[in-house]
Amino acid sequence: MKIIKFFIKFIVTILVVGLIVFYFVQKNTLNNLEKRKNNVTSLWEKFDKKLNDRDKLILSVSTTNSDSLKYFVDKSKLGRQNKVKLLEFEFNEYKLNKFLLNKCLDMGKETESIYQELNEITTEYNSSVKDYNVYYTIFPNFIFAKRKGYKREKFLTIEYGKENQDPIEKSKEIPEWAKNVDTTFLSK
């Protein structure tokens, strides 16, 4: 009888300690995830602010001030408000960037410095997103994250002031690692 009581107390103690450890691991994981998410969000806000500066500069310096330019700037602003549709935002930025490069709008060193800053912020944003996504995918972090409604973030692929590939076409391409892979076993 004493052995059974000892065994029951031992199991209850193990369960209580296990629940306490689980609680602290979950709390720590969610705090770290929240920090990384806030870092991604703050970089997105910094990126958005710099794009607003770019838009003001483009519209003030542009001699043509064409309807197309205003249209592309407005589409870009609308896309930034809804970060969920990142591919659409990138497509609008691609179109605006292409329009500016094709029209050869020479806006001087200010534009070059803004483009350089935008590219630096994009690089920072992508590294922050990578850090967040890697932390998100580690076991058991993704379980806690899904329970709290966190989702993976998407990377930006646009480079400002340079010729880019259409992001929609780029998203349809087969990745380099999958080009020579036999996938016939998947269709069986």
Where are these regions (language model features)?
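A helix-centric hydrophobic-segment signal that preferentially recognizes long
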Residues: 2-188
